[in-house]
Amino acid sequence: LIISLLPIALEDTTGMTAQRQSGSRREISDTGDPVVDVRRTGRIFGWLFIGTFVTSIPARLLFIHGLGATWSDVRFLPGDTSSASLKFGAVLEFGLIVTQLGTALVIHSLVKRQSETLSLSYIAARTMESVFAAIGIISIISVINVADALSAGGDATALTVTGNSHASMYQWAFQWGPGLVAGIGNGVILGYLMYRSGLVPKRMAMIGLIGGPVLILSHVLILCGAYKNGEGPSGLLTLPEAGWELSLGIYCAWKGFRPDSPIARTTASPATRL
């Protein structure tokens, strides 16, 4: 998927030399405020998006390893718990909260020119996704406490039930956060904002507009009991959304937002060169 998107990324290579040559000149609007640097904003956004992958995937793997569980069957297994893996995963998950909130905040001043309502909606979606991530962190830390109590000679039956409850809470927080809210926020809302604004190639943004609803459909099927989260169909239906987010992060980190975007031109239209 990433290889197939490389021609899109190269579309606006022409003219980049001129952009770099003029980069030393600062744009000042009629109000005296500096004009938004769309390329720089896009690159920050891209690196933050890559940061969500760098933190979320290892955190998930560490949680599964720390619980002694599997991707589709997350539960508390007494004797197989690794506190070190769970604690390190919790730290990475907190990093995920920081990076995903950053992706929404860093572009707000720019994309609100396209639609302030949708820009605020994206911030709200990222905040809600972060809330589910925080619930997951608390659940995992609680599992560590249960494992410690079990090692100290506590009631094995009662503590196993408690540990399974916390593990189940984490799994459902994961399902509602990355499994549903991400499809709404990153897929539908962000995909539409990128498509309408032209900050990235429209063909790339279309992947988000397709991947978001597909991920939402997968969430509904899991709720209906069609399959478990992490099983074959779940992974397949997650691919379009994951491909959209990863390609968006790589493209923006590499090239930034397109300066010929209509909202970028709106920002710079009253500007004068110094």
Predicted regions, residues:
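Hydrophobic, aromatic-enriched alpha-helical segments typical of multi-pass transmembrane helices
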Residues: 7-274
